[in-house]
Curated annotation (Swiss-Prot):
Region (4 X 10 AA approximate repeats): 37-82
Highest taxon above the source species: Eukaryota
Sequence repeats (start-end): 37-46, 47-56, 57-66, 73-82
Subunit structure, interactors included: Interacts with hair keratins.
GO-annotated cellular components: cytosol; intermediate filament
Primary role: In the hair cortex, hair keratin intermediate filaments are embedded in an interfilamentous matrix, consisting of hair keratin-associated proteins (KRTAP), which are essential for the formation of a rigid and resistant hair shaft through their extensive disulfide bond cross-linking with abundant cysteine residues of hair keratins. The matrix proteins include the high-sulfur and high-glycine-tyrosine keratins.
Keyword Repeat assigned: yes
Protein name: Keratin-associated protein 13-4
InterPro entries the record matches: KRTAP_PMG, TNFR/NGFR_Cys_rich_reg
Keyword Repeat found: yes
Organism: Sapajus apella (Brown-capped capuchin)
Gene field: KRTAP13-4
């Protein structure tokens, strides 16, 4: 699974597909190269950087937490997911994630991670978001975005 941040494409062999982020400059590879955005075990060695904001290719730092049973990721926030929304998420054991999805949406939608499993959504969706489980393997959780989302549809 990898993020090609500055090209605006999200790819994953786990479910085979692309998520397109409109407005991302494909020529800004100097700001966020695919090698920096690679997801995997190397992400949790010391403090590396990855990209959660494809439009501007902002780099966010993830620190290793040995006390966490699941993802050692700290809370990160991203903007410009393709339709003018914002997203804040905190990955970790029993953590909570909140999303603001859809054009013109002003509120956050809360979802809970059951332990280190897949989060549940009350409004259902089909866009996939990587989830780091206790098995230390990257897997994808499926969401269905609310009306107005430009995310591509996947079957996960």
């Amino acid at each position: 699974m990898s993020y090609n941040c500055c090209s605006g494409n999200f790819s994953s062999r786990s479910f085979g597909g692309y998520l397109h982020y409109p407005g991302c400059n494909p020529y800004s590879t100097a700001l966020c190269s695919p090698s920096i955005c690679q997801l995997g075990s190397s992400l949790y060695r010391n403090c590396q950087k990855t990209c959660w904001e494809p439009t501007s290719c902002r780099k966010s730092c993830y620190r290793r937490r040995t006390s966490m049973l699941c993802s050692p990721c700290q809370t990160t926030c991203s903007r410009s997911l393709g339709f003018g929304s914002s997203s804040c998420h905190s990955q970790g054991y029993g953590s909570r994630s909140c999303y603001s999805l859809g054009s013109g949406s002003s509120g956050f939608r809360f979802l809970k991670y059951g332990g280190c499993g897949f989060p549940s959504l009350s409004y259902g969706s089909r866009f996939c978001y990587p989830n780091y489980l206790a098995s230390r393997a990257w897997q994808s959780s499926c969401y269905r975005p609310i009306c107005g989302s430009r995310f591509y549809q996947f079957t996960c």
